[in-house]
Amino acid sequence: MTFWRMQLHPSDSTRAVAHTTRSLGLGYVGLDFADPLGDLTDVKQQDIDQSQRDYWDFAHCMDVGDIILVVAHHYPCALARVTGPYNYIRAPEVELGVWFRHFRKIEVLGYYADIVTHPAKWEKTTMTDTISILRDPDGVSHQLISKWLAKLGE
């Protein structure tokens, strides 16, 4: 099981929480590109802009059972478990309520504000990229996920 950190909003950060909660409520996490690329299973990692190469990992490295710390405005928002494979649609459908073309089905394990109810006590998890694999078990986000899973009895 791999731990991930992810933001769920397009470039419009003024609606980050709205996009995040809507995506989670629908049971999906996803991402997209400013310069559209197609299905990531058909794309070589080196063909993706350097600033977005981590997106390739979403299709090729993320597995069912992996855990995602969803972040909004540099604070933990939710913890989710990946329950489905990588999917791609050519164009997002507004009726579906998602803005992204690259997505995975998830199960929300919990919301951070339900565990730490006083915002002044929230742990800041500065995040400037859209998605990243958490490789350092001593890192703040990795430790937060481990503690959260322990509270959930997982």
Residue ranges and their predicted role:
Residues V64, H73, C77-A78:
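C-terminal accessory regions
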